From Swiss-Prot:
It comes from the Eukaryota. It is found in: Secreted. The modification Methionine amide is found at residue 10. This is Neurokinin-A. Tachykinins are active peptides which excite neurons, evoke behavioral responses, are potent vasodilators and secretagogues, and contract (directly or indirectly) many smooth muscles. GO terms for biological process: neuropeptide signaling pathway.
Length: 10
């Protein structure tokens, strides 16, 4: 999901 991708680059 969108948030998933965001957490991936975290």
């Amino acid at each position: 999901h969108k948030t998933d991708s965001f957490v991936g680059l975290m």
